[in-house]
């Protein structure tokens, strides 16, 4: 019966997602943002941060709790973003910062090419702002976030190991 309802809803251009998944993700975002900024502010005030590695830096603006601290305190930072489209924006958004090293890779065990899934940019306006930065090696991860299968594209990206990354 649920399959029939899902097909009808899908034919109308909608998708059913678990209510608790959506509700929990919103609650976590709110709590996480408050706590993260407080913790970072405290660490910086006490001079406990001098280098940062940010995995999944996206464009350096959206949902980025670190950007203001990196710029304000001139922190040395290694910013990693696998999706070429987002990486170009990241590069542009930090172009005036001399303390930044940028890496266009995903993290994996080895240096290799892997398939990563993301929302096709043609469909961004159909979703909430967070889908812009939503990408994964698993297509099911995007579907779990309410992205329709036909709105997902794959992209071959470069990967590197943590060890190799930290040696850069």
Regions found by a protein language model. Give the residues of each.
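Phosphate/nucleotide-binding beta-alpha loop and adjacent structural elements of enzyme active sites
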Residues: 2-168
């Amino acid at each position: 019966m649920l399959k029939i309802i899902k097909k009808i809803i899908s034919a109308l251009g909608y998708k059913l997602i678990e209510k608790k998944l959506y509700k929990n993700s919103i609650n976590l975002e709110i709590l996480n943002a408050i706590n993260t900024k407080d913790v970072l502010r405290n660490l910086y005030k006490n001079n406990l941060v001098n280098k940062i590695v940010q995995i999944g830096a996206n464009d350096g603006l959206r949902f980025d709790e670190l950007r203001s601290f990196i710029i304000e305190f001139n922190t040395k930072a290694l910013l990693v973003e696998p999706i070429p489209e987002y990486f170009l924006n990241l590069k542009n958004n930090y172009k005036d910062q001399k303390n930044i090293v940028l890496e266009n890779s995903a993290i994996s065990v080895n240096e290799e090419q892997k398939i990563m899934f993301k929302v096709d940019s043609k469909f961004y306006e159909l979703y909430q702002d967070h889908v812009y930065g939503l990408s994964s090696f698993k297509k099911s991860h995007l579907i779990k976030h309410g992205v329709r299968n036909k709105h997902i594209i794959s992209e071959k990206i470069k990967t590197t190991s943590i060890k190799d990354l930290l040696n850069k």
